C-alpha cells in the first residue's frame, strides 16, 4: 500500500474466501513482498524492499500467523526487488537486493537467526527492476538473473557456491524490461527467460544457449503497459504458459 506505507495480510478460510485483514507499517513506498523462512524457525517471514528509502523491511512471523517483530536492513538506494535463497550453501537463507537507480546489486549472507551481513555490491552496469535466483548452468550452485530497466537488457551472473558471483552476461531486449520468469519454454533442457517490456507492450522471450547465456528469441503482444508476469502450466496440457 504505497499511500499508507503498509502491507495488508488477508487470512485464507480454505474455501477461496479471505477474512481478518491485518495491516503492518513497513516504510515509505513498499514495492513488493517476498516470503521465506529467514530465521529457521519453520515459520514464514516477510521481506519488503522500501522503494522510497534505502532500506528493506523484514517482518518475522509467529505461530499465530501474525508478524510481530520488525527489523530494518540497510540495503542501498531505491531497493526494487529481493531474491531469497541459500547462495553460499550453508543451510541459511541469504538475500540479493536489486536497486532501481544505482548500477549494483547487493549480496547479504544470512546468519540463520534472521540477521544478515553485507558481503558485497556487484556492478551490473545499470539500474535493475527484478531478480531471480536459479541454477541456470546446472552446476549445483545458484546463479542470478535480472532485468536492467533503463538499459533495456537482461543480465546473468554465475554463482561460485560461496556467496560470490562471476561472469556478467547481458542480452538486449525491448524498452523498459521489468518482471522476469525463468522456465524451459522450448523443452530443450535449458532455461529460457520471459520478460515484460513495458514501453513496447510486449513479452520478450530469450532462449537459453549451450553456454548458459541467452539470446533474443521472439516478442509477443501483451496489451497496454504490461507490468508483471508469471509462467506455469495453466491449462494442464504439459506446456508452459505465461500470464
Q: Model-derived features: where do they sit?
A:
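Hydrophobic beta-strand segments that make up the repeating blades of beta-propeller
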Residues: 1, 46-49, 95-98, 144-147, ...
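Beta-propeller blade termini
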Residues: 11, 31-38, 60, 80-89, ...
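Blade-edge motifs of beta-propeller repeat domains
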Residues: 11-28, 60-77, 109-126, 158-175, ...
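Glycine-aliphatic tripeptides that mark coil-to-beta-strand junctions in extracellular
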Residues: 42-44, 91-93, 140-142, 189-191, ...
Amino acid at each position: 500500500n504505497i499511500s499508507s506505507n503498509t502491507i495488508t495480510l488477508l487470512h485464507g478460510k480454505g474455501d477461496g474466501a479471505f477474512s481478518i485483514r491485518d495491516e503492518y507499517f513497513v516504510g515509505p513506498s513498499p514495492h513488493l513482498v517476498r516470503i521465506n523462512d529467514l530465521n529457521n524457525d519453520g515459520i514464514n517471514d516477510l521481506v519488503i524492499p522500501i522503494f522510497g528509502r534505502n532500506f528493506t523491511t523484514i517482518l518475522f512471523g509467529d505461530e499465530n500467523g501474525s508478524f510481530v517483530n520488525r527489523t530494518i536492513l540497510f540495503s542501498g538506494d531505491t531497493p526494487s526487488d529481493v531474491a531469497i535463497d541459500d547462495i553460499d550453501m550453508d543451510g541459511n537463507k541469504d538475500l540479493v537486493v536489486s536497486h532501481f537507480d544505482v548500477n549494483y546489486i547487493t549480496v547479504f549472507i544470512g546468519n540463520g537467526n534472521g540477521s544478515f551481513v553485507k558481503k558485497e555490491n556487484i556492478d551490473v552496469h545499470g539500474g535493475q527492476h527484478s531478480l531471480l535466483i536459479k541454477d541456470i548452468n546446472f552446476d549445483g550452485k545458484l546463479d542470478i538473473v535480472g532485468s536492467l530497466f533503463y538499459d533495456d537488457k537482461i543480465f546473468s551472473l554465475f554463482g561460485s557456491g560461496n556467496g560470490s558471483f562471476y561472469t556478467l552476461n547481458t542480452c538486449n531486449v525491448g524498452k523498459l524490461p521489468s518482471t522476469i520468469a525463468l522456465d524451459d519454454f522450448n523443452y530443450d533442457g535449458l532455461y529460457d527467460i520471459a520478460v515484460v517490456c513495458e514501453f513496447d507492450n510486449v513479452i520478450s522471450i530469450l532462449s537459453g544457449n549451450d553456454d548458459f547465456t541467452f539470446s533474443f528469441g521472439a516478442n509477443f503482444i501483451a496489451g497496454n503497459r504490461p507490468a508483471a508476469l508469471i509462467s506455469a502450466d495453466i491449462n494442464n496440457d504439459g506446456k508452459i504458459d505465461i500470464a
